[in-house]
């Protein structure tokens, strides 16, 4: 698995992957820059040219996938955010701006801001249930090379994302757009077809014998390398010993039953079989480091599509309606769709071939099924954003001001984005090696910032600090299958077992979070970020403190209860849940476990082996409390977080501590949808973590997706959250703050993006920033 995409500890970076984001992780609508509105009402609108100087932004290591189509990690996505503009833009609350051409005035924090973009959008719900998204593009917008941005560039971009061979992280192709399925059918990649045909295939009507030999040579080599990464990871993390058989490693990776003399290919094929022959899907879920497609030398050669049957020549729901207008028709209401339409716009003349574009003849800038021209530009992006890419060298990207930027030429001539260890972020501001970065907001870093400033505050003469609620939240996860009774994860007994642990964990949240974060984080009671409009508020009807009722539904705590009494009450309530789960209770302790349950469980905490994690204190205190009532809790403080993700992928984890990243829309499909109606064949991409299986929850998640009424959806999501809490598969822990720090000596403070939020990052108005010297 890609460790850089994982969201661990107090560092909430995307994934994605998970696309934890809808359209996520790599989609432009979540992250920053161009998607967050052009300049605010304070913008000067200066288009006369940029001034001199260079600003340095420090961030994590980049992977050099700077393509709007194929960027996977947050650091890579930052580059495309600066180089591109998006079809739609969002405001400081994450809401879509519909009238970007003239700009929309919206109030935030008592101030009025104007949000501008490259398009206007009109949404019309039709009587037949379809929905029309009518776009009008702003005149005069140009790419950094001076070429105009037109509706043809938008159409080209959408067809790349919809291509049957597209394998990036965006999921535009999954939207209910009229004609999408018909366009994507009847085409498959050589890669997939050759796998289906097998190594001994004798039919060479679609490829040559030499191609087949090359394919299988490279495929088998990549498979061996893929398995080796798993073996090395299992050995490095103590799951296996050096020299253990492939069978032994596979068993610890969730693939038991292989023969004792199994080979690496046997293991690889077993993984592929689990995913119904889909190697790419298997790789995304099971990788211990590299993706299979990156390990296979000739993958791009075989990623082209070939005809396998009837296929529509176009997507009927994407229509060019005028010189600068476009209509996209959805077959039904989908609350996620508007955010997925906020995609980066890529220039046809750069990523495609203008000679192969003729809208009336169903030609869209590249041969259908062949994205080679797009893939060729992965390391060197071009767009219409505030800065234009120059080079990537020695871990540093150099960019220069885009003199064609539609919302005013940036005041700072150059930007360098350099890879740096997070531990060096604060000191780099002091020493002058960076001007802007996002350090972890730990006690240590907060103290270092205060020490650097002569006034002893977080903002002073050396460093200016801006904090916002992080776009996500911390949690404790409990796998429903591995912490269950009689192998029935959805039974009341199993839920009671998990509630016993959850009750104890919840009792120590206030102590642990205040100790670790001080006033820089707060305890939350529902598994959703406080930044979301769907998050229940203490003043809402039905709001409850998480896991604060006993097995009979009575309150565990009373107002004004002392901490010692609170912890004692939690232990008593937990004992009640253990008893209800089927445990034998004698003299205030559990003495025997029911079938399928245990007297000892493990929780993994990625604290670096030093306990450096916000939930570590919860676990050490819970360990002592549970011991007093007869349950042994093993707290595994991991020096390498990949061990935790490996166990989760292999369905071996019992309990763990981590964090989720959020998106502007609170859709719960990715994490909780289990696809019970189809036997779990297509669950949400992260459902494997909790393995929650609930038809009612599935139905509500889909129901919420099919409405754009925010109040209605909030009601549905509250019911979803209550259902998730009842499963006790997730204990909500904290909403933390994240910070951006600036050099007070080198950046003009009054030009920094005002009223930054979780959705409106520091570079949302980077074109207005100025250097002090």
Tell me what each language-model feature is.
Residues 89-95, 273, 280-325, 329-334, ...:
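Gly/Pro-rich hinge or "lid" segments in bacterial periplasmic/extracellular proteins
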Residues 390, 398-400, 492-624, 632, ...:
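Append "and occasionally in soluble cytosolic enzymes with long acidic Gly/Pro-rich linkers
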Residues 58-128:
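N-terminal lobe/hinge region of extracytoplasmic solute-binding protein
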Residues 119-289, 327, 428, 490-493, ...:
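Aromatic- and charge-enriched surface segment that lines or borders ligand/interaction sites
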Residues 1-53, 234, 586-594, 770-773:
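Short, low-complexity disordered leader/linker segments with a strong preference
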Residues 51-61, 132-135, 154, 326-327, ...:
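Short, well-ordered beta-strand elements
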Residues 74, 79, 334-335, 502-547, ...:
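Detector for C-terminal structural segments
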Residues 59, 390-403, 416-484, 514-518:
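Extracellular/periplasmic solute-recognition and catalytic clefts
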């Amino acid at each position: 698995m890609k460790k850089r995409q994982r969201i661990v500890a107090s560092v909430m970076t995307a994934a994605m992957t998970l696309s934890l984001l809808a359209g996520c992780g790599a989609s432009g609508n979540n992250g920053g820059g161009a998607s967050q509105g052009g300049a605010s009402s304070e913008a000067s609108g200066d288009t006369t040219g940029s001034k001199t100087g260079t600003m340095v932004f420090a961030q994590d290591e980049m992977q050099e996938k700077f393509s709007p189509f194929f960027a996977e990690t947050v650091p890579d996505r930052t580059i495309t955010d600066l180089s591109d503009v998006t079809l739609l833009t969002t405001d400081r609350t994450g809401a879509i701006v519909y009238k970007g051409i003239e700009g929309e005035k919206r109030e935030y924090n008592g101030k009025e801001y104007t949000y501008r973009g490259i398009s206007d959008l009109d949404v019309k719900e039709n009587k037949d249930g379809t929905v029309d998204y009518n776009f009008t593009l702003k005149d005069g917008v140009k790419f950094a090379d001076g070429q105009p941005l037109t509706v043809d560039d938008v159409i080209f971009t959408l067809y790349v994302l919809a291509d049957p061979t597209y394998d990036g992280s965006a999921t535009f192709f999954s939207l209910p757009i009229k004609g999408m399925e018909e366009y994507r059918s009847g085409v498959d990649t050589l890669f997939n077809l050759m796998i289906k045909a097998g190594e001994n295939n004798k039919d060479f009507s679609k490829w040559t014998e030499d191609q087949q030999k090359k394919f299988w040579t490279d495929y088998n080599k990549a498979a061996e390398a893929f398995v080796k990464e798993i073996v090395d990871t299992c050995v490095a993390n103590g799951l296996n010993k050096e020299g253990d058989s492939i069978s032994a490693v596979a068993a610890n990776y969730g693939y038991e039953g292989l023969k004792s003399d199994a080979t690496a290919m046997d293991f690889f094929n077993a993984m592929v079989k689990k995913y119904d022959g889909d190697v790419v899907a298997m790789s995304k879920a099971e990788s211990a480091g590299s993706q299979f497609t990156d390990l296979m030398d000739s993958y791009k050669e075989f990623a082209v599509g070939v005809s396998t049957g009837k296929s529509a020549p176009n997507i009927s729901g994407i229509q060019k309606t005028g010189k600068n207008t476009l209509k996209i028709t959805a077959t039904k209401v989908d609350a996620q769709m508007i955010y997925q339409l906020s995609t980066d716009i890529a220039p046809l003349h750069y990523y495609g071939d203008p000679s192969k574009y003729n809208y009336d003849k169903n030609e869209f800038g590249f041969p259908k099924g062949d994205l080679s021209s797009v893939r060729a530009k992965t390391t060197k992006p071009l767009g219409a954003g505030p800065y234009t890419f120059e080079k990537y060298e020695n871990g540093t990207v150099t960019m220069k001001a885009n003199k064609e930027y539609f919302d005013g030429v940036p005041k700072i001539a150059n930007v360098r984005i350099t890879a740096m260890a997070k531990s060096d972020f604060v000191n780099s501001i002091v020493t002058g090696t960076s001007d802007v970065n996002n350090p972890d907001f730990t006690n240590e870093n907060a103290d270092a910032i205060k020490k650097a400033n002569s006034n002893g505050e977080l903002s002073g003469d050396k460093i200016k600090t801006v904090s916002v609620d992080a776009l996500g939240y911390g949690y404790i996860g409990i796998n429903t299958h591995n912490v269950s009774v009689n192998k029935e994860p959805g039974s009341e007994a199993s839920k009671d077992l998990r509630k016993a642990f959850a009750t104890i964990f919840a009792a120590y949240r206030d102590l642990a979070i205040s100790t670790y974060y001080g006033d820089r984080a707060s305890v939350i009671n529902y598994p959703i970020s406080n930044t979301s409009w769907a998050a229940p508020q203490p003043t809402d009807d039905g709001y409850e403190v998480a896991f604060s009722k006993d097995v009979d539904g009575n309150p565990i705590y009373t107002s004004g209860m002392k901490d010692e009494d609170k912890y004692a009450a939690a232990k008593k309530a937990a004992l009640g849940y253990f008893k209800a789960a089927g445990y034998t209770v004698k003299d205030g302790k559990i003495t025997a476990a029911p079938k399928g349950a245990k007297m000892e469980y493990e929780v993994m905490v990625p604290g670096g082996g030093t306990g450096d994690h916000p939930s570590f204190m919860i676990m050490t205190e819970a360990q002592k409390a549970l011991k007093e009532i007869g349950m042994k809790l093993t707290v595994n403080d991991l020096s390498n977080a990949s061990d935790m993700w490996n166990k989760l992928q292999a369905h071996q984890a019992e309990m763990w501590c981590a964090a989720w990243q959020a998106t502007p829309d609170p859709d719960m499909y990715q994490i909780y949808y289990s696809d019970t109606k189809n036997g779990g064949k297509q669950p949400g991409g992260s459902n494997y973590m909790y393995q929650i299986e609930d038809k009612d929850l599935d139905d509500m998640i889909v129901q919420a997706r099919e409405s754009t009424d925010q109040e209605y959806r909030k009601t549905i999501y509250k019911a979803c959250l209550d259902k998730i809490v009842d499963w006790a598969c997730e204990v909500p822990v904290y909403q933390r703050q994240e910070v951006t720090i600036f050099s007070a000596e080198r950046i003009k403070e009054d030009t920094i993006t005002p009223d930054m939020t979780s959705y409106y990052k520091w570079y949302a108005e980077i074109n207005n920033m100025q250097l002090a010297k």
